[in-house]
Amino acid sequence: LKKSRTQDNWKSVSYSEEIPPRYLSGSGYKNRDTILVFGGCGNPQGKQELGVINYYDLYAIDINTFKTKKLWTIPNDTNNFVIGNNIVADEKNNKLYALCFPNDCSNSYILLKSFDLDSGNNCTNYADTIPFTFNDVNSFCTLYYDSLQSQLYAVTNYNHNNKSNINVYSLAYPPLKV
């Protein structure tokens, strides 16, 4: 949905022709005018009951024109992964940071990875893994960057039997390679 700045109305905007339907993808701001959408899992026709694939692509959405552009795709490696809710883009250092985790097991883990923002190349793993109970819609993880404290924060949440288990992890920024 988009809201008019001059009128009090909303308009539906569809990106399904430009970005294949997906979930378990990450999004974040590249700058004031650009939202990035990275990776995920879904079906190109939007019919997940027919099977899903993991996506390793990055899209940019201009929030002024609502135009979408595919920036890159990295080759599917043997270690399938999906992305936490938020991604962090560092234009100055040409890096895209994401919490990544395998979506094919429930006793999973999260790993902070970076990719070159302009190409998707030079995938780098950071720090150690974080234990993560993955149960589709009952769990999520997200990444935040605090520029004042120069910290990255990874937040995990797992809901089970009407109870939530929430964990917060911090890491100095910029992160060090493993």
Give each language-model segment a name:
Residues 37-54, 98-109, 157-168:
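Short, conserved, GDST-rich strand-edge loop motifs in beta-rich repeat architectures
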Residues 1-9, 50-67, 107-122, 164-178:
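Beta-propeller blade signature
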Residues 29-33, 89-93, 145-149:
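Residue-level detector of Asp-centered blade-edge/turn motifs that repeat once per structural unit
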Residues 137-178:
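Blade-level signature of beta-propeller repeat domains, shared across WD40, Kelch, NHL, RCC1
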Residues 21-24, 54, 81-85, 137-139, ...:
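Beta-rich catalytic cores
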Residues 67-85, 118-148, 177:
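Conserved blade-ending motifs and adjacent loop-strand segments that build the rim/top face
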Residues 35-37, 96, 152:
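Hydrophobic beta-strand positions that form the internal "hydrophobic ladder"
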Residues 1-54:
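N-terminal pre-first-transmembrane soluble regions of secretory-pathway and organelle membrane proteins
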